[in-house]
């Protein structure tokens, strides 16, 4: 019979510390969800869901774009509603400057954001034209970051964007993704690649770019 495998004491200590930290983090996240903490709730990336948080610089750049778009509104422009698709790390910064923001996410941890959270599953988009019907034609700005760099994911993301736009000619769209998606994206939405390059807290292997149906670069400072 093989001898039992045992870890060196220092390795075991590191492992136990890691497990303790993970347990604490999970407990904190569960508490935030239960208490509907709101925009101050913080969560770790879940790589299994292809979650990668934006850098502070990128979050602030996109927040400032939203601020400028809001400043262009007139008193008779009506409500300005914002949808964030699969980009939860943007939520806090955008929510701090505007009240009407919904975060569309598959990850139910973000129920901590209360009524601003909308659970959605891209797999339900193609088979059901009434999916999320209460949100159809409700949004003036949509910022999306599709979770996967696949043709199917881009097609479904474009479909839900089209449904959510209040007015397809006037609603603004910003989409951040890997450059590889460009032919699939531009075949489905009237967007162009911008000079603005979103960055993440952790460097990604794919070349990450942005697309928009308006001149996004004019709104980006120090691009």
From Swiss-Prot:
GO BP annotations, alphabetical order: methylation
Keyword Methyltransferase: yes
Molecular function (Gene Ontology), one example: nucleic acid binding
Compartments where located: Cytoplasm
Pfam families: N6-adenineMlase
Main localisation: cytoplasm
Keywords: Cytoplasm, Methyltransferase, Transferase
E.C. no: 2.1.1.-
Broadest EC class assigned to this enzyme: transferase
GO cellular component, one term: cytoplasm
Record flagged with keyword Methyltransferase: yes
Biological role stated in the UniProt entry: S-adenosyl-L-methionine-dependent protein-lysine N-methyltransferase that methylates elongation factor 1-alpha.
Protein family: Belongs to the class I-like SAM-binding methyltransferase superfamily. EFM5 family.
PANTHER family: EEF1A LYSINE METHYLTRANSFERASE 1 (PTHR13200:SF0)
Protein name: Protein-lysine N-methyltransferase CG9154
Organism field: Drosophila melanogaster
Record lineage: Eukaryota, Metazoa, Ecdysozoa, Arthropoda, Hexapoda
């Amino acid at each position: 019979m093989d001898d039992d495998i045992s870890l060196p004491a220092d390795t075991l200590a590191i492992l136990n510390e890691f497990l303790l930290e993970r347990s604490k983090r999970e407990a904190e996240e569960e508490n935030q969800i239960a208490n509907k903490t709101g925009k101050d709730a913080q969560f770790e990336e879940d790589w299994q869901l292809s979650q990668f948080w934006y850098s502070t610089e990128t979050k602030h750049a996109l927040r400032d774009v939203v601020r400028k778009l809001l400043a262009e509104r007139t008193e008779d422009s009506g409500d300005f509603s914002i949808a964030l698709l699969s980009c939860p790390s943007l939520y806090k910064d955008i929510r701090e400057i505007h009240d009407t923001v919904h975060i569309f996410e598959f990850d139910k941890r973000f129920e901590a954001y209360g009524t601003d959270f909308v659970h959605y599953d891209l797999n339900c988009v193609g088979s059901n034209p009434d999916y999320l019907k209460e949100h159809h034609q409700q949004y003036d700005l949509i910022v999306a970051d599709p979770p996967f760099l696949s043709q199917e994911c881009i097609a479904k993301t474009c479909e839900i964007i089209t449904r959510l736009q209040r007015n397809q000619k006037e609603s603004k769209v910003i989409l951040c993704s890997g450059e590889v998606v460009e032919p699939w994206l531009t075949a489905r939405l009237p967007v162009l690649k911008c000079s603005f390059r979103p960055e993440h807290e952790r460097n990604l292997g794919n070349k990450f770019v942005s697309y928009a149906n308006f001149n996004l670069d004019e709104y980006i400072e120090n691009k």
